[in-house]
């Protein structure tokens, strides 16, 4: 629980850091720096897919990048977004009021975010099942290992064209799933990117903004790698790829500009209880979405259902270890940024 007592030394330090003119200059720098690093991060995997698709080790490289990105997204939700949401709702100006002091709303809204992401997943999966042309089972049957050849079930009377149709159907379902993952992931990222941008845009604290520029630039690179890796595998049309990458790149900078406009128009106080409540609730909701996406649609899907990682033998074992190391490095690198942002 946040303390309601403000020390004299802390108050003096806060007053010295509050410089609207310098803060505005820093925020303009932040807009361009974060935009450029976002473009670099999200377009990296997409360009890799465009120019190296079909080359040796391409699929493995994309998988390793995706596992690194899953670690980044998991750390973003648990180390960055969720603690800030709890902190906002635990502030003494909020936690001293009803109903905020009576119930842990941050945890509740995080759970709602995760369940909402699950609902979207289930709805889309049901839609794919009915529209996949594979009957009521959606074309995704359980296949005993002894009856599977090359990832396809060998049934009596099925050969040649039948197997090719089944393979194409399964590939299309996988692509649709990857597209859904990319879209829901971007929604979760956009939620908390807007919060980050608007919060920075409204802040007049130069001591807070200065280190945030560097930290958020790295943050956007890592998060962009995560989203870009998913987009690269999803097989979107060129226009959709450009749109999704552009949306990711401009969301935080536009949030900063919006925050500056709100402050200029209203003199908005970022310590206002209503602002803290809104930040806490939106942060909790986006955290729930990101936790679900990282654990279920990225980590579990790749480590337990990807053919390259479930293949028996030394090659599959080495790749699995490499992907696990990438996951840990992604989590650690993003967690380290919590020291500054």
From Swiss-Prot:
May play a role in the transport of zinc in the plastids. Residues 49-61, 124-179, 233-243, 302-320 are cytoplasmic. GO terms for cellular component: chloroplast thylakoid membrane. Keywords: Chloroplast, Ion transport, Membrane, Plastid, Thylakoid, Transit peptide, Transmembrane, Transmembrane helix, Transport, Zinc, Zinc transport. One of its GO terms (biological process) is response to nematode. The keyword Aminoacyl-tRNA synthetase does not apply. The keyword Zinc applies. It is a multi-pass membrane protein. This is Zinc transporter 6, chloroplastic. It comes from the Eukaryota. Residues 83-102, 201-211, 265-280 are lumenal. It is found in: Plastid, Chloroplast thylakoid membrane. Its main location: plastid. One of its GO terms (molecular function) is zinc ion transmembrane transporter activity. Belongs to the ZIP transporter (TC 2.A.5) family. The chain crosses the membrane at residues 28-48, 62-82, 103-123, 180-200, 212-232, 244-264, 281-301, 321-341.
């Amino acid at each position: 629980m946040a303390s309601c007592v403000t020390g004299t030394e802390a108050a003096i330090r806060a007053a010295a850091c509050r410089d609207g003119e310098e803060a505005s200059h820093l925020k303009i720098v932040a807009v361009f720096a974060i935009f450029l690093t976002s473009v670099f991060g999200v377009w990296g995997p997409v360009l890799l897919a465009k120019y190296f698709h079909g080359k040796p080790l391409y699929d493995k490289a994309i998988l390793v990048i995706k596992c690194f990105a899953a670690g980044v997204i998991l750390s973003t939700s648990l180390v960055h977004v969720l603690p800030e949401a709890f902190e906002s709702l635990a502030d003494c100006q909020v936690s001293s009021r009803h109903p905020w002091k009576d119930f842990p709303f941050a945890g509740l809204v995080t759970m709602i975010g995760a369940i909402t992401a699950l609902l979207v997943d289930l709805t889309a999966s049901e839609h794919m099942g009915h529209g996949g042309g594979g009957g009521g089972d959606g074309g995704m049957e359980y296949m005993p290992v002894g009856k599977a050849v090359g990832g396809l079930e060998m049934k009596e009377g099925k050969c040649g064209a039948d197997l090719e149709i089944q393979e194409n159907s399964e590939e299309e379902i996988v692509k649709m799933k990857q597209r859904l993952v990319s879209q829901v992931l971007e929604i979760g990222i956009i939620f908390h990117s807007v919060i980050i941008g608007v919060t920075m845009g409204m802040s007049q604290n130069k001591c807070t903004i200065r280190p945030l520029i560097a930290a958020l630039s790295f943050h956007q690179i890592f998060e962009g790698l995560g989203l870009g890796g998913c987009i690269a595998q999803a097989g979107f049309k060129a226009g959709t790829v450009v749109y999704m990458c552009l949306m990711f790149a401009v969301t935080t900078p536009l949030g900063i500009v919006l925050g500056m406009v709100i402050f200029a128009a209203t003199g908005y106080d970022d310590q206002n209880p209503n602002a803290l409540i809104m930040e806490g609730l939106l942060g909790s909701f986006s955290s729930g979405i990101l936790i679900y996406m990282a654990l279920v649609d990225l980590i579990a899907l790749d480590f337990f259902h990807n053919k390259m990682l479930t293949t028996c033998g030394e090659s599959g074992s080495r790749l699995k270890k490499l992907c696990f190391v990438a996951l840990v490095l992604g989590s650690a690198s993003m967690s380290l940024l919590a020291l500054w942002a």
